[in-house]
Amino acid sequence: MQHKLLFSAIALALSYSAQAVIVPEGTQLDEKQHIVINNGAEPQSFDPHKTEGVPESNVAYQLLEGLVTSDSEGKLQPGAAESWENTPDFKTWTFHLRKDAKWSNGDPVTAHDFVFAWRRLVDPATAAPYASYLSYLQVENAQDIIDGKKKPAELGVEXKDDYTFVVHTTNPVPYTVSXXTHQSLLPLPXKVVEKLGDAWVKKENYVGNGAYKLANHIINEKIEFERNPLYWNDKETVINSATFLAIENPSTDVARYRAGDLDMTSYGLPPEQFAKLQKELPGEVYVTRTLGTYSYELNNKKAPFDNVNIRKALNLSLDRNVITDKVLGQGQTPTYVFTPTYIEEGHLIQQPAYSKEPMAQRNEEAIKLLEEAGYSKANPLKFSILYNTNENHKKVAIAAASMWKANTKGLIDVKLENQEWKTYIDSRRAGRYDVARAGWNADYNQATTFGNYFLSNSSNNTAKYANPEYDKAMAESYAATDAEGRAKAYAKAEEILGKDYGIVPIFNYVNPRLVKPYVKGYSGKDPQDHIYLRNLYIIKH
């Protein structure tokens, strides 16, 4: 992976050519250069410290640009920083910011803006869903600040001068640069946020440093962007304006696409239409294998899911192959582990032994566990599956509920509960659920982005899973001196999570979507499937 090329045993400044959309010579561009994309939901917020999902990151990456970013294939590229270096122990990282980078109000983008933003992220007063991210990266004092033991000003970041941003970590973190692409580490216009508080995200107040500006927002309908002429690389940008729609229903998404109302669907096509779409729209169906896991989170602190045998029974009696092959059938692969084994340094993670056992044997053991817990046909285990409103999630939930009932001979009785995106996120975070549909996509291509999720003190850990041995295994990954040592620690942590049955992993994601043939610059090869408008262009059609 690209980030291996970034690290040196000596302090070495690394520079990259500026990222830009590549338009082949002789290409006839469309005059309008406007694109309509379905974003899949109404975002929680335009504040990157108040969000945690894909609809939100899709918006954030247009309006704001971090230290580093990525190209259309997911390869690391310079962003607000034009170069960086690290000390031999991988514990001090120095980023040199572009002196021509400006906020959309004309102010320069400085190291002070990054210091302000990163401190705000870990400040308990912010209550950021991703507060733990800087703790994951081992930034000095991050966890103590989150826990209220130290002040945000004590975070291990500094503005050495206006254009030099320095990060100090307590342990070696050789993948620091890769992790800096994440939405939670985007800079904020410190003067604007300090003056306006939470109102800074309103359309009339929004100031960003990204390739686009916020032009309009109609809640639950659309978000409109316009090109930012003050963006440092605006001369290489082609798309002039864009509209993101908030269509949650995949069938409606496809219908609007076929009617010509949008140029790119959200990720996730209706399974029953997939083969037909491949046949009727050759070249327009993209299927991107991503670093993501679809699972059912179990509320580990809520009875009866605080009983490991109940969690085990649910894992045993769910046939993942039925969901991937018969319900979805778009290239998803069944999994019984949370961390994708194909992510960097995840290669030592093994699927559990029961994944290879016949379903009849697994079902028999699940029934025994449920009966021992006091359940029967007359007194079945009853719970609800919470999912965000989406017909594909509903199909998976119906299949899971049916399998759990049939495979345990009526010892499980499941109801379905759907909520719109923002309410669903709030319910999971507040622990108002039994079992919840969950999807986790890599924040960067390295196994810690999954392993850290289930740390006892993780702000992302909505399953409320906690095991000191798991925490210890993840700590060992930071103490490891090489990639193989880290890989062993990740495998150990995953094995502990598996023996605790803390979650029900179901499949590894693919992102199927439709893209009009006149939309260029989308490769379908980015393992995180980020959408950057600055990477796209429209040809004459």
Curated annotation (Swiss-Prot):
Cellular location(s): Periplasm
Signal peptide location: 1-20
First-listed, main subcellular location of the protein, grouped into a coarse class: periplasm
GO BP term (any one): peptide transport
Gene3D superfamilies in the record: Dipeptide-binding Protein, Domain 1, Dipeptide-binding Protein, Domain 3, Periplasmic binding protein-like II
InterPro entries membership: Peptide/Ni-bd, SBP_5, SBP_5_CS, SBP_5_dom
UniProt keywords, alphabetically: Peptide transport, Periplasm, Protein transport, Signal, Transport
GO cellular component terms, A-Z: ATP-binding cassette (ABC) transporter complex; outer membrane-bounded periplasmic space
GO molecular function ontology, one term from the record: peptide transmembrane transporter activity
Oligomer and partners: The complex is composed of two ATP-binding proteins (OppD and OppF), two transmembrane proteins (OppB and OppC) and a solute-binding protein (OppA).
The protein's role, per its UniProt record: Part of the ABC transporter complex OppABCDF involved in the uptake of oligopeptides. Plays an important nutritional role. Binds peptides containing from two to five amino acid residues.
Protein family: Belongs to the bacterial solute-binding protein 5 family.
Protein name per UniProt: Periplasmic oligopeptide-binding protein OppA
